[in-house]
């Protein structure tokens, strides 16, 4: 599974475990040398060490690398020695490299800094890899969410006093058009997962009314799907695996674009949206961006980044509306770009809105409801 999800990723590969473990002794020696010259030494082992204590530090780290992060945190509570050992930055950097491609979602509060893994350990001497891992991993985020139910209940109650209208979401992006399996068609034909709630009467010129669905058979929400061009042009581009001309956006000049992944900044066209889409942006409560996450294709992420920024422009509506990014592939077993890498490529950390990147596939709609639930929570509806 790891090799499948990590294909196309610079932080993954079938030889990752072997490479890290083969070099752990050399890296550990360098780190210990730096520690002796820059800070206090870790506390000595207990006076009557168990067999595990008598092993070389490199062997201890190798054994610890086989444990789960939860087990490590529990081991750190045994005594001062193990508390220091389980905080070893090399160990937690290894966990980040190993587990990050497998995470199915990441949000604006948990995205790890790309510099954590792109720079050497000595360059990141001040970084707390353990804290970065525990902040980013889905299990920790789930525990944090479950520990704040009162706030969610209060905001949901207050919102119900103000408005009863179903939330409206604008959905756009290349994943709607480039995949061999149509996400929208699957949504329309999955009544057990997404029951249809009808077509609203509120029309938007040139766009229509969108389609309403039930979430958990209780909460209604409306999706306005924004395609880049006509069906014929989209199909032609999909068959040729090329990008169709996007007629939702109008070039406005040039803007500095962060190169990402260590590349230097470059000049790129900035965009505005056409009048019909501008009307949509003023009315919706949030956005769904469907990214093509198939690793086999080439993607112009910098262009996508500029288009996302144009769509969520604060001048077109209330600030802070949530953005759900669906990292979508056609089939569940396809090689995909991990959601953390996709978030970095789209430069989502530069946005001033709450966002979530969620793995999904068009065939089974896996992850779609989790993303909708997140939007409802951000809007105070749950």
What role is predicted for each listed range?
Residues 142, 152-197:
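Conserved G1/Walker A P-loop phosphate-binding module
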Residues 283-382:
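Conserved GTP-binding G-domain of TRAFAC-class P-loop NTPases and closely related GTPase folds
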Residues 188-238:
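Switch I (effector-binding) loop of TRAFAC-class P-loop GTPase G-domains
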Residues 95-145:
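Charged, amphipathic alpha-helical linker segments immediately N-terminal to NTP-binding catalytic cores
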Residues 51-68, 72-86, 92, 96:
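Short hydrophobic alpha-helical "box" of cullin-RING ligase substrate receptors
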Residues 47-50, 68-69, 144, 154-159, ...:
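Eukaryotic intrinsically disordered and solvent-exposed regulatory patches
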Residues 240-264, 270-295:
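Inter-motif core of Ras-like GTPase G domains
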Residues 1-54, 99, 107, 112:
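CRL adaptor-proximal regions
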């Amino acid at each position: 599974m790891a090799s499948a999800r990590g294909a196309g990723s610079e932080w993954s590969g079938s030889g990752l475990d072997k490479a890290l473990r083969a070099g752990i002794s050399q890296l550990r020696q360098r780190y210990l040398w730096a520690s002796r010259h820059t800070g206090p030494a870790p506390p000595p082992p207990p006076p009557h060490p168990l067999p595990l204590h008598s092993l070389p530090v490199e062997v201890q780290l190798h054994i610890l690398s086989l444990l789960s992060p939860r087990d490590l945190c529990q081991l750190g509570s045994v005594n001062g020695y193990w508390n220091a050992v389980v905080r070893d930055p090399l160990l937690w950097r290894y966990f980040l490299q190993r587990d990050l491609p497998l995470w199915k979602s990441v949000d604006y509060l948990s995205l790890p800094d790309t510099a954590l893994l792109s720079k050497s350990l000595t360059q990141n001497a001040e970084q707390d890899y353990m804290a970065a891992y525990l902040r980013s991993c889905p299990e920790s985020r789930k525990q944090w969410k479950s520990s704040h139910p009162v706030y969610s209940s209060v905001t949901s109650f207050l919102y119900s006093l103000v408005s009863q209208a179903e939330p409206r979401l604008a959905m756009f992006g290349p994943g709607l058009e480039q995949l061999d399996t149509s996400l929208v068609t699957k949504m329309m034909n999955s009544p057990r997962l997404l029951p249809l709630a009808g077509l609203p009467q509120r029309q938007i010129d040139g766009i229509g009314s969108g389609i309403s669905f039930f979430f958990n058979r209780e909460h209604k929400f409306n999706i306005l799907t924004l395609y880049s061009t006509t069906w014929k042009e989209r199909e032609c581009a999909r068959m040729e695996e090329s990008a169709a001309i996007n007629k939702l956006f109008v070039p406005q000049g040039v803007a500095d674009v962060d190169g990402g992944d260590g590349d230097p900044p470059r000049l790129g066209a900035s965009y505005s949206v056409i009048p019909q889409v501008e009307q949509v942006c003023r009315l919706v409560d949030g956005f769904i961006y469907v990214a093509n996450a198939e690793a086999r294709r080439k993607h112009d992420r910098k262009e996508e980044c500029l288009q996302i920024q144009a769509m969520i422009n604060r001048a077109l509506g209330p600030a802070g509306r949530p953005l759900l990014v669906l990292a979508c592939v056609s089939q569940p077993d396809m090689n995909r770009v991990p959601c953390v890498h996709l978030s970095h490529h789209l430069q989502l950390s530069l946005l001033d809105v709450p966002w979530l990147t969620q793995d999904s596939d068009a065939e089974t709609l896996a992850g779609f409801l989790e993303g909708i639930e997140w939007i409802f929570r951000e809007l105070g509806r749950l």
